[in-house]
Structure formats: structure tokens, C-alpha cells
């Protein structure tokens, strides 16, 4: 899907992106989160020039999850110019998610 990159901060990565960033807040133990993997791969394939997808493990980055008030998994947050503009909790089918995101890009 995407390559892992190191950033000094999450905010730096968001503000440095020239396209909107869809952040997938997940946990390895979360079954619905695992269901999102192929869905996000399809989204990435169809919207790769218009969107960047980043996965954040809420177990490793609990402070980020808390900062963005993540209380359910999976939660997708769309950021534009470093600011959260849309939030989706739970699993959506790829076509539904793509249609929803296209209306926001």
C-alpha cells in the first residue's frame, strides 16, 4: 500500500503533505481493522494521486489516539492541510468509502 517513512512528528507529516491524508487508526487485535486492509488497498489504488493513506497503531501511539479522541476502531480521519475534516468509524465497503472520499477531495 504505502511505504513506511519516518517523520519527526505526526503534525509535520500532515502539514507537509501536498494531498489530503486519510489516517487509519487501528489495532492489531481488532478484527474489523483487519477487514479494512484490503478495502484501504483498493482505495489507495483508485485514489493514489489524490490521497495519501497512513496507518496509525493505537497501541503504539496511544497519545495520538487520545489527541484525536479515537474511541472506536477502526476510525478513519481525513486531514486536509493538517486539519481533520471528516471522520468515519467502523467498516465501510471499498466502493462506499471511495464514493464518500471523492466527494471530499
What are the roles of these predicted feature ranges?
Residues 1-22, 27-50, 59-63, 67, ...:
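Proteins that catalyze or organize thiol-disulfide redox chemistry
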Amino acid at each position: 500500500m504505502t511505504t513506511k517513512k519516518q517523520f519527526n512528528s505526526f503534525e509535520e507529516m500532515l502539514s507537509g503533505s501536498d494531498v489530503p491524508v486519510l489516517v487509519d487508526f487501528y489495532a492489531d487485535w481488532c478484527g474489523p481493522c483487519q477487514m479494512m486492509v484490503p478495502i484501504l488497498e483498493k482505495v489507495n489504488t483508485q485514489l493514489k494521486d489524490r490521497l495519501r493513506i497512513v496507518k496509525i497503531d493505537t497501541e503504539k501511539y496511544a497519545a495520538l489516539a487520545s489527541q484525536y479522541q479515537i474511541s472506536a476502531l477502526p476510525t478513519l480521519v481525513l486531514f486536509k492541510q493538517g486539519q481533520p475534516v471528516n471522520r468515519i468509524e467502523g467498516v465501510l465497503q471499498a466502493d462506499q468509502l471511495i464514493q464518500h472520499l471523492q466527494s471530499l477531495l
